A protein has these predicted regions:
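Active-site neighborhood of divalent metal-dependent phosphoester/pyrophosphate hydrolases
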Residues: 1-12, 116-119
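Catalytic phosphate/metal-binding cores of nucleic-acid and nucleotide-processing enzymes, i.e., regions
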Residues: 51
């Protein structure tokens, strides 16, 4: 899913954010470069939400700027539950992958937040995120047992 940082407009665009985002152009360029490589496929959505079914499980991918929590004591959990509930009313997802909050966590049983590849930085300080080393998330979906492993990948 696209992020909100490489947008070409001062504020988020909703109907056309895919065409106003440098990451979209990067994805299109990569898709063109690898167009003859049969082992690689790109799924470049025009929507903020992307769905991918694997082993009969529907996975939802989203950046996360859609979920706002204003630094409340409950943190991200309640607003995230509400967003997932609203989205599930349209398309039910078995699991959710979010990238925006720059902190690796599993805030709900059906959602994993990706860590920050660059690690703790001035933005993390400004938003009050807890210190974390540079990391990404890993989730294993087994064809028979479902989601079995959720773990950080340390990127130092």
């Amino acid at each position: 899913s696209r992020g909100n940082h490489p947008r070409l407009t001062p504020k988020m665009q909703f109907a056309n954010d895919y065409s106003m985002n440098l990451e979209t152009f990067l994805y299109w360029s990569l898709a063109d470069y690898f167009k003859n490589e049969k082992r690689i496929a790109f799924k470049i959505e025009q929507s903020e939400l992307s769905y991918l079914t694997i082993y009969g499980k529907t996975n939802r991918f989203f950046h996360g700027h859609q979920v706002r929590f204003a630094g409340g004591i409950g943190g991200l959990t309640i607003p995230l539950y509400k967003a997932i509930h609203r989205w599930n009313a349209n398309i039910k997802a078995d699991y959710n992958f979010m990238c925006d909050k720059h902190t690796y966590s599993n805030p709900t049983p059906d959602c994993q937040c990706n860590g920050s590849l660059i690690g703790y930085n001035p933005m993390a300080v400004s938003f009050g995120f807890a210190y974390q080393k540079p990391l990404q998330s890993f989730t294993l979906l087994d064809s028979k047992r479902g989601y079995t492993i959720k773990a950080p990948i340390f990127c130092e």
